[in-house]
Regions:
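Active-site entrance/lid segments in N-terminal catalytic domains of soluble metabolic enzymes
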Residues: 1-203
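Conserved active-site-proximal phosphate/metal-binding subdomains
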Residues: 17, 167-211, 217-353
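Residue-level detector of alpha-helix initiation sites
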Residues: 25, 216-217
Length: 353
């Protein structure tokens, strides 16, 4: 039986974090269902307000309304079990506002990547209920963040998420590293990152749980991560093919129908490589740049005149089921997903129940 996951004074019965997926793939329904099973359900705040009536006119306002709404709803669905958190990308233009809204709404955890969350401790009071974690992909990034947090804020991470090269969405690796992924000894890197956290555990006299993500697919994968020294795992792609996932049926079927050969790496307007399902949208991009008629002000660094497509428009189209105009991010193992399931069944499978 897997041990429970402790983060601060909170306990998740199952050491499974459902990874945040945006836009609109992991919202309150999915996160609440995962938490209810005793795991950690994570809502993506990326353009989370896309269904709010204010969105077309004021995206920033709509997103803040939706952050609070979805955290509240997920907690209600969880019925006091597990934890409900948010994933907030550092690359977002309104990063600070998203963090403050999540804290105000009572998010149990904030997980932050797609950049280095150097200022996160400044935004989340250590005495608040909310616990914080950076996403890292290398020992170098882990040490850089933990060293900065210790020096500037006299504080360390409440937990850390290590995201490996098989993860979906935005990736903390170069295109060259991803192309040679099969020859990468990432287990050694995981051990190095865990070793790095021990230094800060000693300094701050607290345990820093380590969560491993990227390519975790089976119970055997979960156990392998635990054997490496992890306290838990983060799984994202497999939760797309659940009844509770917030995405459209067409989005889910894009996963079910994908083969290994359909998975590719593209350059995202975020400025990082991203893993996605090759579809009509991607094939169209290879022929010509998509015209951008409106900027949704989602990213801190994005020039509509130079990026090949609008990531907001593409991700919203996908989650609503428009696959010809939609970008479908996925993990490296999406080709192995071949049937629909439920959150309960998937969680039971992952923990070997």
């Amino acid at each position: 039986m897997l041990r429970e996951l402790r983060i601060g004074d909170m306990v998740a019965k199952l050491p499974i974090i459902q990874g945040g997926m945006g836009v609109g793939v992991s919202l309150s329904r999915l996160a609440g269902a995962v938490a209810k099973e005793g795991g950690v359900g994570v809502i993506s705040t990326a353009q989370i307000g896309f269904e709010e009536p204010e969105f077309e006119k004021d995206q920033a306002k709509a997103n803040l309304i939706a952050i609070k709404k979805h955290i509240k709803k997920a907690k209600e669905l969880a019925c006091g079990h597990g934890m409900v958190g948010v994933n907030i990308m550092v690359a977002l233009k309104h990063y600070k506002e998203h963090v403050l809204a999540a804290v105000e709404a009572g998010a149990d955890v904030i997980i932050s990547g797609a950049g280095l969350p150097m200022e996160l401790p400044e935004l989340v009071d250590e005495k608040s209920h909310t616990r914080i974690a950076p996403i890292v992909s290398s020992k170098r990034a882990a040490n850089l963040i933990l060293k900065m947090w210790a020096h500037r804020y006299n504080r360390t991470a409440d937990f850390i998420v290590i995201e490996g090269p098989k993860a979906g969405g935005h990736l903390g690796f170069s295109n060259e590293q991803l192309a040679d992924m099969e020859h990468m000894d990432y287990d050694s890197e995981i051990k190095e990152i865990i070793s790095c956290t021990k230094t800060y555990e000693e300094k701050f006299k607290k345990h820093i749980p380590v969560i491993v993500a990227g390519g975790v697919f089976t119970h055997e994968d979960v156990m392998h991560c635990m054997e490496l020294g992890a306290d838990g795992v983060q799984v994202a792609s497999r939760f797309v093919a659940t009844e509770e996932c917030d995405a459209s049926d067409a989005y889910k079927h894009a996963y079910l129908n994908a083969n290994e050969s359909d998975v590719q790496i593209i350059q995202s307007p975020v400025g990082m490589p991203g893993r996605d399902v090759r579809n009509g949208f991607i094939r169209g991009l290879e022929k010509k740049k998509q015209p951008i008629t409106k900027c949704y002000n989602c990213l801190e660094k994005c020039n509509p005149a130079t990026v090949p497509y609008c990531i907001t428009k593409a991700l919203i189209a996908a989650v609503k089921g428009d696959m010809q105009n939609g970008l479908v991010f996925c993990g490296a193992n999406v080709g192995r997903i071949n049937r629909m399931t439920t959150v309960h069944e998937l969680m039971s499978e992952l923990v070997g129940a």
